[in-house]
Design a protein with these regions (language model features):
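Catalytic-core regions of glycoside hydrolase
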Residues: 1-140
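Catalytic domains of carbohydrate-active enzymes that cleave complex glycans
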Residues: 1-32, 40-56, 139-242
């Protein structure tokens, strides 16, 4: 009944083509049969709509249960080796060793490197759940995000929200959303340079000969690398704009 009522509203709003449905976050092998049953229960009703799920277990994609996986960045390697037609990445609370994330405790380069990684590995999108979650886990009670940044101890600080509630209900930026903006700006600049000069030129800026490779668990660990890399990209763009 819900889907039958929802679909006409999506059409009316003109967003049905950009709407995504999902069955369950991070299904495990123990949940294979129940996930399959849940998907089959709604598959006919969602025919023609895009479906995706957060996923770490390649078997769900390999057996056709998840056609568009959104992979945890610390489990993405099998998906890169046998790549789906569309591949998104994500991080949340479990991605705290080595890989990019946006926790308050982490240095800024670990947040900003995401844009460079997305370009190199040609990810189609990126997902994170927490923009302005100002509650304890399960929304049992509200919290003051200026005093509590971890959903009352449920998640690492920085995971539940990227902006603070400001005056007149306008969002106040955090340093982390500024770093995310820089990451996406890096990605846009790289894509633009690729249009002008080709992918090889961009990759030479990212991984100059003799330099450290950019991977998901191993990458240059300094903001200086990112600043210099972006300067190289900008210079290459400027050369072609004259």
């Amino acid at each position: 009944q819900f889907l039958a009522a929802l679909k006409p509203e999506l059409e009316k709003l003109g967003i049905s083509e950009v709407a995504y449905f999902h069955i369950s976050d991070e299904p495990s092998r123990e949940q294979f049969d129940s996930y399959k049953a849940a998907k089959e229960a709604v598959e006919k009703d969602l025919e023609g709509y895009q479906m995706m799920d957060a996923l770490s277990d390649y078997e769900f994609y390999e057996k056709g249960l998840v056609s568009q996986p959104v992979c945890a960045v610390n489990h993405i390697q099998p998906f890169l080796e046998k790549r789906p037609e569309k591949l998104w990445g994500y991080y949340c609370t479990g991605q705290y060793v080595d890989v990019t994330n946006r926790f308050i405790v982490q240095p800024g380069y670990r947040t900003r490197i995401l844009g460079t990684q997305m370009y190199k590995y040609q990810l189609d999108g990126f997902l994170h759940w927490g923009y302005n979650f100002y509650n304890a886990e399960h929304s049992i009670f509200p919290i003051d995000p200026y005093r509590c940044t971890d959903a009352a101890g449920a998640f690492p600080s920085g995971d539940p929200f990227l902006v603070y509630p400001g005056a007149d209900k306008e969002p106040e930026e955090s340093l982390r959303i500024m770093l995310m903006d820089e990451a996406m700006s890096d990605l846009c600049a790289m894509n633009y340079l690729e249009e002008l000069a080709g992918r090889d030129v961009v990759m030479e800026c990212i991984e100059p000969e003799g330099g450290e490779k950019v991977e998901f668990e191993s990458y240059p660990r300094s903001i200086a690398y990112l600043v210099e890399m972006r300067k190289k990209v900008n210079r290459e763009i400027e050369k072609r704009m004259k």
